[in-house]
Amino acid sequence: MPAEGSLAQEFVQFAVESGVLRFGQFKTKAGRMSPYFFNAGLFDDGAKLGRLAQFYARQLLAEEQRSGLAFDMIFGPAYKGIPLAAAVAIELARLGRNLPFAYNRKEAKDHGEGGTLVGAKLQGRVLIVDDVMSAGTAVRESIALIQAAGATPHAVAIALDRQEKATENGLDVEHSAVQYVTRQLGLQVCAIARLSDLLQYLSEKSDSPSGGETLDGQRLKDHYQSVLAYRERYGVN
């Protein structure tokens, strides 16, 4: 489910100002040339990561009120999901919701506690926390790990839903990775913001007297048409 409008717009502005959401020409995993790029790895200091966790927590608590979303613990898939899961768990605890969290290693450890899982025991309804969902590979791998541990994959929280067609065998299909996870795998997906929110942000900045200058001095209105054209070519509803 998408975030409430003002929260989504606030998040998009934060991502742009932090340099996490950038504009230009970027090649995606699917081989497309995208006019924007969301790099969650650039939430790279305590203040930015802490604020990012606040957005996740606000969206999750809002979704709890809106749809009854409930979960018993948090799981972060390696690698980007690891700090996200920890940060979101800290923020939820600060807000009075103290939940266990866990994550996985890419490589199994053959000494100490061993295995690929670290943190709390996977049990109950598990929320998977990641940055974006391009092909859904990390989510499918997480689902397999969670089920193998005897727990239930219940929902996924991401920062940005790109709202674009997924690919299968190198060909575009008429659904996004998020829609596949929702419809075929039966997991609720909560996104802080979507591509439609980014377009709204760019449109509103384009109409401002300043033309919406970014941190590098470029005008955001210069990117609106390219992002819109990308959405029209590859987008899903």
UniProtKB/Swiss-Prot annotation:
The residues the entry assigns to the signal sequence are none
Q: Supply the name of the protein.
A: Orotate phosphoribosyltransferase
Chemical reaction(s) catalysed: orotidine 5'-phosphate + diphosphate = orotate + 5-phospho-alpha-D-ribose 1-diphosphate
Q: Which domain of life is it from?
A: Bacteria
Q: Care to name a GO molecular-function term for this sequence?
A: orotate phosphoribosyltransferase activity
**Which PANTHER family does the annotation name?**
OROTATE PHOSPHORIBOSYLTRANSFERASE 1-RELATED
Cofactor dependency = Mg(2+)
The residues listed in the UniProt record as binding orotate, with positions renumbered to this chain, are 37-38, 134, 162
Query: To which species is this protein native?
Result: Polaromonas naphthalenivorans (strain CJ2)
Instruction: Please provide an example of a Pfam family that matches this protein in its UniProt record.
Output: Pribosyltran
- NCBIfam families attached here? pyrE (TIGR00336)
Free-text function comment from the UniProt entry: Catalyzes the transfer of a ribosyl phosphate group from 5-phosphoribose 1-diphosphate to orotate, leading to the formation of orotidine monophosphate (OMP).
